[in-house]
UniProtKB/Swiss-Prot annotation:
UniProt keyword Secreted present: yes
Main location: secreted
GO cellular component, one term: extracellular region
Keyword field: Antimicrobial, Disulfide bond, Fungicide, Plant defense, Secreted, Signal
Bridged cysteine pairs (disulfide): C30-C77, C40-C59, C45-C71, C49-C73
Signal sequence region: 1-24
Pfam families in alphabetical order: SLR1-BP (PF07333)
Name assigned to this protein: Putative defensin-like protein 160
InterPro entries noted in UniProt: DEFL (IPR010851)
Localization of this protein: Secreted
GO biological process, one term: killing of cells of another organism
Amino acid sequence: MAKLSCSYFFILMLVFSALLMVECDEGKRCHTTIDKGNFCDLVDCRLSCFSGYNGVGKCFDDPKVPGRSNCGCLYNC
């Protein structure tokens, strides 16, 4: 019985990890940070995001990334 439970648990973990590996589905919005560590200029941020990802760029503060403001890009996955 213990072997059977362990096998089911292992299969369940494989299925769960496969679902986690899928980053984005169609129609979902993804976010990436552009030019980490550089001060965000809104015009350059929006231009970089639109040309690179066909998305919308905005400046934001991120405590994990040094600097006053960073460029974030929202785009369709």
